[in-house]
Curated annotation (Swiss-Prot):
It comes from Achromobacter cycloclastes. This is Pseudoazurin. Residues 33-121 form the Plastocyanin-like domain. Its cofactor is Cu cation. It is found in: Periplasm. Residues 1-28 form the signal peptide. Pfam families: Copper-bind. The gene is bcp. Its main location: periplasm. InterPro entries: Amicyanin/Pseudoazurin, BlueCu_1, BlueCu_1_BS, Copper_blue_Plastocyanin, Cupredoxin, Pseudoazurin.
Length: 152
């Protein structure tokens, strides 16, 4: 009788573990964006310049070359999302939870077009606001290209 009860407990425990594994959410992904003096798209760039992630994913912005930071661009983040700004020359990790499009810039090199786009999720509700934001000419050209690369 003890073996039957023990087997029942083991079997119930196994079922509980299996149920928890099935119910567990997929692990969030980690991405890297490098801040470079020179990249495939020219001088002062984020590589990649556009990135699509899922809510809960993390992006680490890495100043591969010195003198860079990352900061959200005013008017280019989803409602409810928090703006962020890193220090110069420091890696900066962001976990994106609010779906939408985030425009980012390197503060010292914004006028030179050092910008990028992170899209969180598939249907960015703030896309029109992002497209309507005013930016320096070179920055706007690169933002338009980054949005186009994401299919927007």
């Amino acid at each position: 009788m003890e073996k039957t009860m023990l087997n029942a407990i083991k079997s119930g425990f196994g079922i509980a573990i299996a149920a928890m594994l099935v119910a567990a959410p997929a692990a969030a992904a980690d991405f890297e964006v490098h801040m470079l003096n020179k990249g495939k798209d020219g001088a002062m760039v984020f590589e990649p310049a556009s990135l699509k992630v899922a809510p809960g994913d993390t992006v680490t912005f890495i100043p591969t070359d010195k003198g860079h930071n990352v900061e959200t661009i005013k008017g280019m983040i989803p409602d409810g999302a928090e703006a962020f700004k890193s220090k110069i020359n420091e890696n900066y990790k962001v976990t994106f939870t609010a779906p939408g499009v985030y425009g980012v810039k390197c503060t010292p090199h914004y006028g030179m077009g050092m910008v990028g786009v992170v899209q969180v999720g598939d249907a960015p509700a703030n896309l029109e606001a992002v497209k309507g934001a005013k930016n320096p000419k070179k920055a706007q050209e690169r933002l338009d290209a980054a949005l186009a690369a994401l299919g927007n």
